[in-house]
UniProtKB/Swiss-Prot annotation:
This protein's UniProt keywords: Cell inner membrane, Cell membrane, Cytoplasm, Membrane
HAMAP family noted in UniProt: HflD_protein
The keyword RNA-binding belongs to this UniProt entry's keyword annotation: no
InterPro entries attached to this UniProt entry: HflD (IPR007451), HflD-like_sf (IPR035932)
PANTHER family: HIGH FREQUENCY LYSOGENIZATION PROTEIN HFLD (PTHR38100:SF1)
Protein's organism: Shewanella sp. (strain W3-18-1)
Protein name: High frequency lysogenization protein HflD homolog
Keyword Ribosomal protein: no
Superkingdom as given in the UniProt entry: Bacteria
Amino acid sequence: MNEQLINRTMAFAGILQAIAQVQHLARHGELDNAELAASLNTILVTNPDNTADVYPDKIVLQKGYKLILNQLGDSSQKDVEITRYLVGVLALERKLVRSNSGLGMLAERINQVNRQLHHFAITDEQVVANLASIYSDIISNLGPKIQISGNPVCLQRPIVQHKIRALLLAAIRSAVLWRQLGGKRRHLVFARKAIVDTAKKSLTL
């Protein structure tokens, strides 16, 4: 398999994984802590030696690969809401990489969170709130806001709001990596089969 395509598909699985977690949280108000940690940790890996360093939890990433099969394959299980969130994330990522000040502030704020992790777990409410504020302060204002659908009772809870924003930041991080690896929106239309085949093979590794 083409190494670049493998890495690009891994990053795309990372985007979908984080988006699906946003959807689950918005509907149910709860998310497995290990899954949350796997996505949030990707934000902090800013200088990886390889793509696999960003996604060490292969079990969680498998869900992202399965979402690729559902969203890009011949499956009838395509989720319109996931597609809507994906379009929003990719649009915000484009705005971010064109904003030198945004990228600089992002790096600085991520360093602050890294220092926090000497004392707290990444899923600690204070850390999650700080990641959420990075999204609100730097990303959210770059373009149209992503409208999250779900259970109104869940969406009113501050901790759920914080986790959703932190996960959107994780999705943006994977989108930046996907683009750095040569990912383009047109690939999602014209190179779907290659992406789906790579996801299938990655699931069996």
